[in-house]
Amino acid sequence: MIKQALISVSDKTGVLDFARALSAMGVNILSTGGTAKLLAENGISVTEVADYTGFPEMLDGRVKTLHPKVHGGILARRDFPEHVAALSKHDIPTIDMVVVNLYPFQQTVARAECSLEDAIENIDIGGPAMLRSSAKNHKDVIVICDPSDYSLVLHELNTNNGEATYETKFALAKKVFAHTAQYDGAITNYFTSLGADKQHATRSSYPATLNLHFEKVQEMRYGENPHQSAAFYRESNPQAGALANYAQLQGKELSYNNIADADAAWECVKTFDEAACVIIKHANPCGVAVGITPFEAYSKALQTDPTSAFGGIIAFNREVDGNAAEAVAKQFVEVLIAPSFTEQAKKIFAAKQNVRLLEIPLGDAVNSHDFKRVGGGLLVQSPDAKNVTLAELKVVSKKQPTPQQLQDLMFAWRVAKFVKSNAIVFCANGMTMGVGAGQMSRIDSARIAAIKAQNAGLSLVGTAVASDAFFPFRDGLDVVVEAGATSVIHPGGSMRDQEVIDAADEHGIVMLLTGTRHFRH
């Protein structure tokens, strides 16, 4: 049965109710600084750590709990007679519970105006020491670093004669070690990102050492293939709009490939202002469209490649209503993603329980970095978040684009960014007409896109074409024009740009350069 608890928290969420409940159980509460003041002001009996140790807080609060009477009471093993004798000799009572969360270092350094001095003053010293001491001796000490665990611990204390089960103590200890590791990793990332100048005014996006912290969401039946094991991890606090914030409304457990494809679909559909639908297969868009309603967007997107859409991942950037749900329900779909679903839509999909429905609130989340594992290393880059504006486009052909062509070209360019390289995308009237993806030569991607359109019964006459990178020769351009394209958008930057521009003029088509490449591997 716990007799004494030490509470010292930066995040004071729920701490009053928790401390009040402990006090009602007869637990003596030790505390420091602002936490002690808050408890006392709210009528909760509390002993200041300085009074308990007989040693005052000093150095502007830098030294509060770093004292043998604190750490001895935490670290002593109750089943070791030598430890018990040492406590008795030095008049050190045991501390049976430690409730600590740390100075907000990560939030502090995330501020643009944060100085090195600000960062240093938000490095917690005593807190991690107490947490680690308690977690090390978790057999005898209940340690809490997360306010969300208060209710669990109180429930166990109330049902187990003032004690927590070993299973709970061990789980809380694991959580503490993960928490302190993340905290120290954040400090390391910050310090190793600072420049060598005296004022440390420059800060690199790529620290000398990189510490990553992700929390396991689930283990999966298998990975990309059945012989591979896999798990899904998420950041501690994903940004609004990130896939990791999904809520699954129904359907089987998400697979490795489901999550990878769902992310590709969601990232693409979020880039559109109009109601949009994206259909993904093997991480490539096989149909993308915008419309007045989700139903219209889906109907148009499906036309691009209905064969490949079978068993695909579908994402909307608007609430899915009954009309859209009825249309999608006619198709075999693995995962359906949207900001929300109407009750009618939910009812329709309830009859198809294998369909995984994911709700994700819309947001502008962009990963701070993208990662790619290589043998013995990790490639790290900023995300491809560049969106070209009309003002940045350069018309290099003699023929000027019409407003409709500009609209089609911008749509095609937006889609091409999410197609595996080499990427060629034919578009018209707010929908993809043919998608060529992942070929080693650009000319083959162009041919495949044209074949896809032909197989779907779609005419490419008058279409706009986007290429994720420049045309190295005119042959790729000749193929898309032969298929029916009358306008083309690509980054430019080839040694043979002028040759390709001359070919565009020869064909009498519109050509725009973006100056931005969108390789995707």
Swiss-Prot record:
This is Bifunctional purine biosynthesis protein PurH. Its EC number is 2.1.2.3, 3.5.4.10. PANTHER family: BIFUNCTIONAL PURINE BIOSYNTHESIS PROTEIN ATIC, BIFUNCTIONAL PURINE BIOSYNTHESIS PROTEIN PURH. One of its GO terms (molecular function) is phosphoribosylaminoimidazolecarboxamide formyltransferase activity. HAMAP family: PurH. The IMP cyclohydrolase activity resides in the N-terminal region. One of its GO terms (cellular component) is cytosol. It catalyses: (6R)-10-formyltetrahydrofolate + 5-amino-1-(5-phospho-beta-D-ribosyl)imidazole-4-carboxamide = 5-formamido-1-(5-phospho-D-ribosyl)imidazole-4-carboxamide + (6S)-5,6,7,8-tetrahydrofolate; IMP + H2O = 5-formamido-1-(5-phospho-D-ribosyl)imidazole-4-carboxamide. Pathway: Purine metabolism; IMP biosynthesis via de novo pathway; 5-formamido-1-(5-phospho-D-ribosyl)imidazole-4-carboxamide from 5-amino-1-(5-phospho-D-ribosyl)imidazole-4-carboxamide (10-formyl THF route): step 1/1; Purine metabolism; IMP biosynthesis via de novo pathway; IMP from 5-formamido-1-(5-phospho-D-ribosyl)imidazole-4-carboxamide: step 1/1. Belongs to the PurH family. GO terms for biological process: 'de novo' IMP biosynthetic process. Residues 1-145 form the MGS-like domain. InterPro entries: AICAR_Tfase_dup_dom_sf, Cytidine_deaminase-like, MGS-like_dom, MGS-like_dom_sf, PurH-like. SUPFAM superfamilies: Cytidine deaminase-like, Methylglyoxal synthase-like. The lineage of its organism: Bacteria, Pseudomonadati, Pseudomonadota, Betaproteobacteria, Burkholderiales. It comes from the Bacteria. The gene is purH. Pfam families: AICARFT_IMPCHas (PF01808), MGS (PF02142). Keywords: Hydrolase, Multifunctional enzyme, Purine biosynthesis, Transferase.
